[in-house]
Regions:
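Structural signature of PLP-dependent enzymes
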Residues: 1-29
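Short glycine-rich or small-residue beta-strand-to-loop segments that form or flank ligand, phosphate
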Residues: 12, 53-55, 92-97
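Flexible, glycine/charged-enriched surface loops at secondary-structure junctions
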Residues: 16-23, 39-46, 82-84, 119-130
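Short gly/pro-enriched beta-turn/loop segments at secondary-structure junctions
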Residues: 28-30, 35-38, 47-51
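Conserved PLP-binding catalytic core of the aspartate aminotransferase-like
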Residues: 41-74
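A common structural junction motif
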Residues: 72-79, 113-116
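PLP-dependent enzyme catalytic core of the Aspartate aminotransferase-like
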Residues: 85, 89-137
Length: 137
């Protein structure tokens, strides 16, 4: 655990605090924009959200745990569930650390789109990735 903490500190010092905060802000914004464009409701007050995770309400008719399993088994992407009264109602999609990268955001959005479409969620194909790319432009 101490080695991991040391490595994290080393990476942060090398990148610089301001650059790390900005990187997480950018990728968090791109993820949130992409999810919204897919017709998903973002969970919570977005004016006070964190940049490193996006809460998203699981759409009606979608099996949240089944979708998470498909994301992991089919695409190698893990998204989080919620706990307590929000379990089965909200996913947590991280954009922190290694996942605070353009390719990770775009791949996650594309994979989630496929899983949702297979599950019956109606959305405009490519809308999530397109919206995220506009944030990056």
């Amino acid at each position: 655990m101490l080695y991991g903490a040391r490595e994290c500190a080393r990476l942060l010092v090398n990148e610089g605090m301001d650059a790390a905060v900005e990187r997480h802000r950018l990728h968090g914004e791109a993820m949130a924009s992409g999810l919204s464009s897919m017709g998903l409701e973002l969970f919570g007050d977005q004016s006070v959200k964190m940049n490193n995770v996006v809460g998203v309400v699981i759409p009606d008719g979608i099996n949240g745990d089944g979708a998470r399993t498909s994301m992991l088994e089919d695409f190698g992407i893990e998204i989080g569930t919620s706990f307590g009264p929000l379990h089965g109602k909200v996913w947590r999609i991280g954009t922190m650390g290694y996942n605070a990268r353009k390719d990770a955001v775009l791949t996650t959005l594309a994979a989630l789109e496929q899983v949702l479409r297979i599950g019956g969620h109606r959305l405009t194909p490519g809308s999530g990735v397109h919206s995220a790319l506009e944030v990056y432009a």
